[in-house]
């Protein structure tokens, strides 16, 4: 699958692509788990950078052993915060242009992880989604209300509070 991503990287005229663990809602349990799709890494925190000739996986200390087992054949593993992505990228002989899905990053996370080590190019269509056709895998489920035992308050009471707040604005 990495080879398919590298073809897309070439087609987009970029040097690499950044894949975080999170989804666009920054959920703890991300779906789709794009990082696992591309790296096989199943930990709850991590980020991959796929370059034309190298693959990097950044994980925190809880996951270094797991990352080596699950992804070590195809990725160079780095432990954050001991080594930040910008430190690795600065060692490359040129300043790469990296694509990223702008829905998956905050401005602060881009600055803290990449500083001035690369040129960042937002790409609106997520490249991992293109490879795995992930946009068609979202399954709708019926919504449901949690019981008052769980929420501490009836739904109608919460809706009334929300309604009065919105009326004031």
Over which residues does each language-model region extend?
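N-terminal accessory/capping or targeting/presequence segment of soluble
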Residues: 1-93, 101-169
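Ligand-binding face of N-terminal immunoglobulin V-set domains in extracellular IgSF glycoproteins
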Residues: 98
